[in-house]
């Protein structure tokens, strides 16, 4: 999409690259660009990632005929909920079961096909999607909170909805300033 390319140009080419060009180890960053193109009935979703200065994307994650959930950051809690297993499973199978990479991939595919939670569907009401987003954010926060070590996720969350007819709309928003300086929309 043109918008995803423009976001990549602004975020990566014009800001990230000049800021970190001289660094030996560059920070990783990733973001998702999602929404409705002009005159389109269905939304699209693109992912852009920068790993140590190497850019991947914009990559089409979800086309106009697909629905789903995308998450980044601390994925473990949501991976377990949606897929039914930990992201560490392939490494455990390789180390403890001495399985080949091909056998591991086949097993992971079988588990995903049979254990993935179907929590999202095409006719899902917007309020259900909002509630699911809130649930997944708090699931991740609490998973991090109760895992050994310092919590790496927390604080107030922000939720926005993008619909064809209402466009971008804040649902839950952190207000750092008074509402006249930081308006709802």
How would you label these PLM feature ranges?
Residues 1-185:
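N-terminal nucleophile
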């Amino acid at each position: 999409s043109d918008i995803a390319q423009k976001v990549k140009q602004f975020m990566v080419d014009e800001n990230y690259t000049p800021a970190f060009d001289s660094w030996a180890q560059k920070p990783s960053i990733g973001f998702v660009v999602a929404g409705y193109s002009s005159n389109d009935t269905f939304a699209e979703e693109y992912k852009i990632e920068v790993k140590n200065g190497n850019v991947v994307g914009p990559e089409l994650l979800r086309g106009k005929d697909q629905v789903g959930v995308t998450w980044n950051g601390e994925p473990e809690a949501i991976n377990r909920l949606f897929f039914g297993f930990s992201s560490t499973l392939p490494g455990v199978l390789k180390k403890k079961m001495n399985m080949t990479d091909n056998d591991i991939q086949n097993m992971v595919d079988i588990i995903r096909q049979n254990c993935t939670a179907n929590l999202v569907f095409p006719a899902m009401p917007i309020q259900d999607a909002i509630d699911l987003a809130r649930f997944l954010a708090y699931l991740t926060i609490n998973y991090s909170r109760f895992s050994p070590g310092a919590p790496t996720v927390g604080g107030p969350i922000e939720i926005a909805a993008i619909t064809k007819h209402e466009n971008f709309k804040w649902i839950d928003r952190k207000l750092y300033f008074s509402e006249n300086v930081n308006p709802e929309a």
